[in-house]
Amino acid sequence: MGSVRVAIVGVGNCAASLVQGVEYYKDADPDSKVPGLMHVQFGDYHVSDVEFVAAFDVDAKKVGLDLADAIGASENNTIKICDVPNSGVTVQRGHTLDGLGRYYRETIEESAEEPADIVQTLKDRQVDVLVCYLPVGSEDAAKYYAQCAIDAKVAFVNALPVFIAGTKEWADKFTEAGVPIVGDDIKSQVGATITHRVMAKLFEDRGVVLDRTMQLNVGGNMDFKNMLERDRLESKKISKTQAVTSQIRDRDLGADNVHIGPSDYVAWLDDRKWAYVRLEGRAFGDVPLNLEYKLEVWDSPNSAGVIIDAVRAAKIAKDRGVGGPILSASTYFMKSPPVQMEDTKGRAQLEAFIAGEVER
């Protein structure tokens, strides 16, 4: 079936992990279980079929560099898992709009280069899938790139908490244009959101009433520094919260009983994230039952392990001529999909989609 030609907007830590990951797993045996991957072979596409053909950023230290160099430039501080050879892809100047918040502007220098013609570039490079890795709070910028994807007839993977796939207006736009979208807000392989979801569902399934819960996250990357600007966090908090509360059947915990969100920036953590989660409930005889745990992860590789499948799902949909939200992939890969499902059901739907048994 050929390659999956990918463009990236936002060459930060998540992009760095994704680009490294494709190189790291390029020779993985498609018939074996490989640590770190849900699918070595995803339908017709092996990891090695993913090819990066365009990249956009606004950081002066990244624009003009080869993608292989840009992923280690400026404030990027994720773990290095392999060397990446020269890609032949030069990072182009993207469009800023609301993509740079206060802390980004205090930290980086915005490129003085003229912004690229995004739609024309996507067409010229024959891009299959555009991955949106913009900073949290980039509402206008994310929607701008979503429209570019529609105009260029390029599938869109929305990794950030701006509600596009999950809103009727945008879902209709993608459907009418015949362009696939997978979104919104990437759900990491084994991160705070999916473990919290599983624990909340476990309480429900075992007859324990969940009364209140919290999830506190700290990290040392630019994502966490950006999120110190609380005005940019509204959609992020909504996304992380509904991902967990959607697992509680027929009951609203109430806003005062749920606190989920980023909490602070700790520079020495680099791209590591520490999540502290607590669930308080009542078991047999209304006896209190509390669960508390701490999760430590490298944030960006944890995300890349899911995006590597999301881009291939988007390409399969494009190959099949399916436009609009790809519900199976969105449900399993994203925190805020158009339709929330239990993760086991979402996985089953995804496998059915890969096999061609369901349209989307």
What residue ranges belong to the model's regions?
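Rossmann-fold NAD(P)-binding glycine/threonine-rich loop
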Residues: P135-D151, A159-P180
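NAD(P)-dependent Rossmann-like dehydrogenase/reductase catalytic/cofactor-binding core
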Residues: N302-R360
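Rossmann-fold dehydrogenase core element
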Residues: K173-I186, G207, D211
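Active-site-lining helix/loop region of Rossmann-like oxidoreductase modules
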Residues: V9, S48-E51, K62, D69, ...
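Short glycine/serine/threonine/alanine-rich loop segments
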Residues: V127, K153-V154, V179, V208
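Short catalytic-loop micro-motif centered on adjacent basic/acidic residues
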Residues: L130-C132, F156-A159, V182-D185, R212-T213
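N-terminal glycine-/serine-/threonine-rich beta1-alpha1-beta2 phosphate-ribose binding loop
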Residues: M1-Y145, L233-I238, A275, F284
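Gly/Ser/Thr-rich loops at beta-strand to alpha-helix junctions
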Residues: G10-A16, L134-D140, L160-G166, K187-T193, ...
